[in-house]
Every structure is written in structure tokens, then in C-alpha cells.
Amino acid sequence: MKNQQPANEIPVYLFIGFLDSGKTRFIQETLEDPRFNAGEKTLLLVCEQGEEEYDPSRFAFPNVVIRNVDGIDEILPANLEKMRKECDAERVVVEYNGMWMPSDFMMALPEDWAVYQSFMFAEAKSFPVYNANMRNLTFDMLNNAEFVVFNRYDDSCDKMTLHKIVRAVSRGIQIAYEREDGTVEYDEIVDPLPFDINAPVIVIEDKDYALFY
């Protein structure tokens, strides 16, 4: 989360992942937490309907307005800003549809909206299959996420496979593995450097400068 919010900027918290991957539960728990929900007027955009439903009575404050978005054709800058203004929201939380490209949402952001945090959720056992069958979509999800949570993780899951899928897209994404009992393991797999530090001339691509320095 950004520490300082420029005047008139609308923070956006984006939650992406396939249907029933845990987005609704995480958002519900987040809005129940007074450390996140301290009374700011919040617009919650729900772009898909899964098995779980929101319980506004459990939110930390009654300051959240829920709006359903039924089609990708509704993801337009003017329409998004219209929904925000109707409830005078100071920030926006988005449960994004698991079959829509997150990049489409990024391109449709109204001028004063800024994504402050983006989380991706995936079921650990099924994600490699999704990745094999819908590679363009999983790539776009990972490319627009800062943090990915693989839930329903257990010892039968291939952690290295999950790690490699993520790292093939970005070395900067944080990875966590959540077990059924709620315990979380953070990814600590060390990746080889993407350049040869022993070469006579070290060739570093632009995206790898931060790793070098």
C-alpha cells in the first residue's frame, strides 16, 4: 500500500484469480478488519458470482457499497467513475472476473484511479492445469499481480512447479502457499541470477538492473 495518497487519487485494490479461488473470502476478511476498513467510503465491485457471498453485517464499518458488474462491456472508464461517484467512494475494491483479462481493467482505469495493491488467488492443485490450458489468461493475471496466494496447498502439491510458473512471468511477485488449516508458507526458493556474474562482459537486461544492484 502506498504511504502517501496524492490529492484526488482513488486507491484501487484489485483481486484476481479464477472462480472459487478464494477471492471473496479474502476480501470479506479484509473488510472485517478495522486496520484496513477504518470507515472510508468504499465501492466494492463484484465481477463474478461464486459459491461464497458477502456478509456486509460483518464488515468493520457500514461504509461499503456493493455493485455487481455483469459483463466486460461495463468495464469502461466513464462507467467505473459513474459508479464511484454515485456512492461518493474514497477507494475501490475489485473482485475481478476470473475469465477476463486483468490488463483490460488496467487499461480502463479512470484518470484519477490508481492500483495500490493487486492480489492473485489460485487453487494450488488445479493451477498447473489452468496454466497449461489457458496460458494467455494465467500469464496476464500474473503479469498484473504483486502477490499470489496458492491456497488449499498440501504436501502433495509440487511447489517447484508453481514457483517456476510464476517466475517465468516475473521475479518480483511475492508467493505464498496457504494450507487448509490457514497456515501460510512464504516462498523461499532461491532463483539463479538471470546473468553470468563471472562472464568477461556481464550482460544485464533492463528488467534485471534491480537484481544486479
Model-based region annotation:
Residues K2-I16, S21-Q117, F121-V129:
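Nucleotide-state-sensitive switch-loop elements of NTP-binding domains
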Residues Q4, D155-Y213:
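C-terminal accessory "lid"/substrate-recognition subdomains
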Residues F26, T42, Y96, Y130, ...:
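Generic detector of bulky aromatic hydrophobic side chains
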Residues E32, P62-I66, W113, L137-M141, ...:
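Short, low-complexity, polar/charged sequence segments that are solvent-exposed and flexible
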Residues D33, D55, N68, L76, ...:
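Serine/threonine-rich low-complexity intrinsically disordered regions
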Residues R91-Y177, G182:
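Phosphate/Mg2+-binding loops and adjacent switch elements
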